[in-house]
């Protein structure tokens, strides 16, 4: 890997050329712009009814994939172009709240629709074909919550569900002539959907003014279907992975205690279980995770399950001082991780013109994540607030009796420091902050997952 600040790629007269970069510390192909709009409308005809309309819109310019643009092959860039197309998101939601209805203090209903578009575009250096893979996602969701206060007990119950539809298309374009041709898709090119519905109930009991107990339960059902219609680009796929069907029942529990020994201290302990149901990204796609490695579908992936614990201590003094520290841990069963895979008895296939090792998502036996975070806030001179936080996380996959390897997606030590000015009338807020992180050592990279050790920075070698 190199820092791509010494050159950039241009195409002139049907040829890719490397030209020097005359701007020191300028990295061509590393920036983009994003636009976000949000509008809410609130209508409250009386004390019992409340109507809320929520509109959100977000879009971007093209987003260069800077890490892929640093790949080299025979002293030349591997790619002349590699970028995400505009990432489009539109959401509209309607919420109605009703007080004193159905024996509840408050009932609310929310119905929402989201449309999401994204695309990936790449062209190898010296070649004319620009590959474009496009994804369109439509999500319709409905949720309802019922709340009742009975003496020192607060009870919530409700349901929520979502219908998710995915359309995946692809083509390639000759950048010189504009000619179009077919191309393999990122996700199955047939019908793709994932639907889920869940019901929950939670309870909060103020045992004493200083001690509160909370508990809850959630039950869920999900169904998934994904199919490949065009066999032209995936002749290596067997019939059992060309059509993936899954139905999963899930459940989780939670239990927590909050204790205030004094008015300035709070101690909290929480225990819970959790789950994550495989989606089409987990079980259905074919893609090159990194050079020389191709990921194929595995319809046998099961839901991940977790046991979680969190211990928190907070010291506060009105709105002038806050110190909070927590220690957390998660134990995963059937953790979904990438592992070497065989397909029709083969461990390697040719994909996108390159011989690649075959990988697929599998349920590893166990994994764990532990860590700690601390935060400090202090107000001074009435209108200024200093804020700092620091987080450390560590995780391993336990595969077999004694075999361990790093869990991917684990961040190195990271934190934030900042300063905020807020006027006395709250009409002006100005904030300055800085984000920082430590290095991630090479031996903490997951070699088979998505940590992408090939793009590790020089600091990881120290």
Residues covered by each model-derived region:
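Face-selective signature of the C-terminal outer-membrane beta-barrel domain
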Residues: 42-58, 85-235, 249-254, 258-266, ...
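Outer-membrane beta-barrel translocator domains and adjoining extracellular loop/strand segments
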Residues: 6-7, 64-72, 119-127, 167-176, ...
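C-terminal structured "cap/appendage" subdomains that terminate the fold
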Residues: 459-462
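Acidic/polar loop-and-plug regions of large Gram-negative outer-membrane beta-barrel proteins
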Residues: 7-21, 58, 65-83, 106, ...
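Extracellular loop and loop/strand-boundary signature of outer-membrane beta-barrel proteins
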Residues: 22-27, 75-84, 95, 125-134, ...
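Transmembrane beta-barrel wall of Gram-negative outer-membrane proteins
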Residues: 4-62, 88-92
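Outer-membrane beta-barrel signature, preferentially recognizing the C-terminal barrel domain
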Residues: 79-95, 100, 188-196, 241-256, ...
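Gram-negative outer-membrane beta-barrel transporters
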Residues: 208-209, 221-222, 328-331, 341, ...
């Amino acid at each position: 890997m190199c820092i791509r600040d010494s050159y950039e790629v241009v195409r002139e007269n049907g040829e890719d050329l490397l030209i020097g970069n005359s701007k020191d510390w300028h990295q061509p192909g590393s920036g983009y712009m994003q636009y976000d709009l949000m509008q809410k409308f609130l209508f409250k005809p009386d004390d019992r009814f409340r109507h809320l309309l929520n509109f959100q819109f977000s879009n971007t310019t093209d987003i260069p994939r800077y890490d892929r643009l640093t790949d080299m092959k025979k002293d030349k860039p591997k790619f002349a172009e590699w970028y995400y197309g505009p990432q489009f998101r539109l959401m509209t939601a309607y919420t109605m709240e009703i007080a004193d209805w159905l024996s509840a203090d408050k009932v609310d209903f929310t119905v929402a629709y989201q449309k999401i578009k994204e695309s990936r575009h790449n062209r190898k250096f010296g070649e004319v074909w620009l590959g474009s893979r496009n994804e369109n996602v439509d999500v319709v969701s409905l949720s309802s919550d019922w709340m009742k206060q009975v003496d020192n007990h607060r009870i919530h119950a409700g349901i929520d569900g979502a219908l998710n539809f995915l359309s995946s298309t692809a083509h390639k374009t000759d950048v010189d002539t504009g000619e179009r041709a077919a191309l393999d898709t990122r996700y199955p090119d047939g019908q793709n959907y994932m639907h889920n519905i869940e019901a929950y109930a939670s309870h909060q009991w103020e045992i004493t003014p200083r001690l509160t107990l909370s508990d809850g339960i959630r039950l869920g059902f999900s169904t998934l279907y994904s199919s490949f219609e065009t066999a032209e680009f995936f002749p290596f796929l067997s019939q059992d992975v060309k059509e993936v069907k899954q139905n999963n029942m899930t459940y989780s529990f939670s239990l927590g205690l909050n204790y205030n020994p004094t008015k300035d201290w709070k101690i909290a302990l929480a225990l819970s279980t959790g789950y994550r149901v495989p989606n089409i990204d987990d079980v259905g796609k074919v893609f090159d995770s990194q050079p020389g490695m191709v990921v194929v579908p595995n319809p046998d992936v099961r839901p991940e399950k977790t046991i979680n614990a969190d211990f928190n201590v907070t010291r506060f003094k009105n709105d002038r001082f806050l110190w909070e520290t927590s220690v957390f841990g998660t134990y995963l069963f059937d953790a979904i991780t990438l592992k070497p895979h065989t397909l029709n008895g083969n461990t390697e296939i040719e994909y996108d013109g390159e011989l690649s090792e075959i990988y697929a998502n599998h349920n590893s036996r166990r994994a764990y994540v532990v860590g700690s975070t601390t935060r400090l806030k202090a107000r001074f001179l009435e209108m200024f607030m200093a804020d700092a936080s620091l987080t450390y996380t560590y995780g391993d996959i336990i595969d077999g009796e004694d075999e361990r390897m790093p869990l991917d997606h684990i961040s190195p030590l990271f934190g934030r420091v900042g300063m905020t000015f807020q006027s006395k009338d709250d009409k002006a807020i100005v904030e300055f902050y800085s984000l920082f992180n430590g290095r991630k050592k090479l031996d903490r990279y997951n070699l088979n997952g998505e940590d992408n050790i090939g793009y590790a920075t020089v600091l990881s070698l120290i």
